[in-house]
Amino acid sequence: MFKKTVPLLSAVAIAISFSAGTGVANAQENASYEVNSPEPKSNDFWWPNKLNLEPLRQHSPESDPYGDDFDYAEAFSQLDLEQVKKDIEELMTSDQDWWPADYGHYGPFFIRMAWHGAGTYRVQDGRGGAAGAQQRFEPLNSWPDNVSLDKARRLLWPVKQKYGRDISWADLMVLTGNVALESMGFETFGFAGGREDAWEPDIVYWGPEKEWLKGDERYSGDRELENPLAAVQMGLIYVNPEGPNGKPDPLLAAKDIRDTFGRMAMNDEETVALIAGGHTFGKAHGAHKPEECLGAEPAAAGVEEQGLGWKNKCGKGNAEDTITSGLEGAWSVNPTAWTTQYLDNLFGFEWEQTKSPAGAIQWIPVDGQASNLVPDAHVEGKRHAPIMFTTDLSLKEDPEYRKIAKRFHEDPKEFELAFAKAWFKLTHRDMGPKQSYLGDMAPQEDLLWQDPIPAVDFELINENDVEQLKVAILDSGLSVPQLVRTAWASASSFRGTDMRGGANGARIALEPQMNWEANNPAELKKVLDTLKGVQEDFNDELSGDKYVSLADVIVLGGAAAIEKAGKDAGYDVTVPFEPGRTDASQEMTDVNSFSFLEPKADAFRNYYAEGNRVSPAQHMVDKADQLTLTVPEMTVLVGGLRSLDANYNDSDHGVFTDQPGTLNNDFFVNLLSMDNEWKKSSDNEAIYEGFDRKTGEQKYTATTVDLIFGSNSELRAVAEVYAMSDADEKFVNDFVQAWTKVMQLDRFDLK
């Protein structure tokens, strides 16, 4: 039973409020006060260098109010998506007094909501993106770049409330962006559901700065942006629209655009399409100076604001007095229709600097041209000049962007299709292969960025076939460590952040994965050649349409090796295996895009590349987080893989056993034994040497990620479980379960 303790001072305060009667209670309800009850200091306060294991505990099932039994895919399948779209479309022009729509249409507002939800995605580590609807939580709900989007989500609440659990906030926000575009005359490329909601904020490194929109701490050298970041400042989605650090230079801004959009996996054509397409709609808001008018962001606002922020005390507080970015104006004459007016204006006028009423640098046509071209969003009869940001002019001034923008201007159909495809990519980039898509509105064609995998068009092998194939693999001459290493290298490329990688597709046999240093290319080639031979021979013996893919053979090889290793250690082990993987081709694989999945470290193989800025232990936690592992799963996998002798390049660091290649718990037993003492190596400060405490004889070598399981108090507590005298069966079962989980992370067809 869960017991929530109450701090002593809080308990006293509660007792006083009850005994004082309703007068005190009413006073409390009407008062504005800060909660000053004492807060416990975290261990990080005292020991800031302590290894943080919290990423492995985030998004616990206990946080989900729907519980383990809820099947979102099943719930989503009950939706009448066309009716949902009709309800959303009706919302577009249902003006609300508390937040009036610009030009009588909420479409541009909802496009910004969807864009800023999806646009946090970064290709370097797959974090960010639309999945989870993280825009509802801190820090994203309070970023300066997301001012007013709290109102967009509140406008959408009646639709969410109506359809309940059948559509997640994450899916609804993206679908609403699509409907917004369609309601203004644009033909979208499609929509797929499948984004489940999160119930707490992601633990994400958004940058080193401690203030919003300040500093260049994330840059070094010749404006080199720190990895894995994909925005120029803390609190921005991409770039500063006024130019780098507010400097209104379109060419310098183009460099920032190319870098940040590239880190979101967009090429130049997609970047131009997104900027030009997105700025066809709506307007920027900077009617007054934010510092003089806006209240606290949602995370800092009072409880009476009910999750809303940036309360505006100037003028009406909304409509023509709205403040978001501080820039003010519209790009197009008709901001609620799909047109080429953005490009018409970009190339049709020369532009001069001006400032918005809020003091932000922006651009208008020179010499007062077109000063009455654009209607006001709220005041009838009032008109304005069109505007451009510094970053808009980058599309005109940068030579490569200009070529693309001119081409789009001359061919509106090409522009429309390019924007449709780029928008679909923007809003679906973090969902992985099409196998994870829900609904029937997604495009049928395979897109390279989706990491396509062929459909199963053959009969799967049965249990008898599996047993025969395991024998053939074990008789091939490959060792247990080789088979385990190869299966792990294939499956552990998976990233739970954007559902990319994994064993399905056998991309470990393709560029670039086959030449990743962590995969030991020389050994990998020999193993793959042997497994391909086994696969071909086996398929030749099969009858009918029965077939086994290389991807399945690789995973089954790991399973067979673990079963043998368990048997050699005295355990009867069965590793679950589900056939059904297929093999991708090199043509289906974007080499540049897949290069971002290359591990810079893999503690499970005791691999750590040179030039790393992050510690081995931190890399270990990050890798485990990407594999969606818990602390116990990470622990048992590291210990088991050490005993299986599965280290990178046959290293013996952490192999604390006299029987390498067998499945045993010796790693934990010997690591925690007081018979051994550890010292840093005099030859290599990254290596530790283990000595017999009595004889002084050196017995083992280890790395940080080996010894951390004995030095970190939390990891040691888990390691002790697997070192106990009664731990044999639990260790084996837990290892097999965790191993199988990793092997099946990308099997969306099984979920």
UniProtKB/Swiss-Prot annotation:
The gene is katG2. Keywords: Heme, Hydrogen peroxide, Iron, Metal-binding, Oxidoreductase, Peroxidase, Signal. Its EC number is 1.11.1.21. PROSITE patterns: PEROXIDASE_1 (PS00435), PEROXIDASE_2 (PS00436), PEROXIDASE_4 (PS50873). Formation of the three residue Trp-Tyr-Met cross-link is important for the catalase, but not the peroxidase activity of the enzyme. The active site is at residue 116. Residues 1-27 form the signal peptide. There is a cross-link at residues 238-264 (Tryptophyl-tyrosyl-methioninium (Tyr-Met) (with W-115)). There is a cross-link at residues 115-238 (Tryptophyl-tyrosyl-methioninium (Trp-Tyr) (with M-264)). This is Catalase-peroxidase 2.
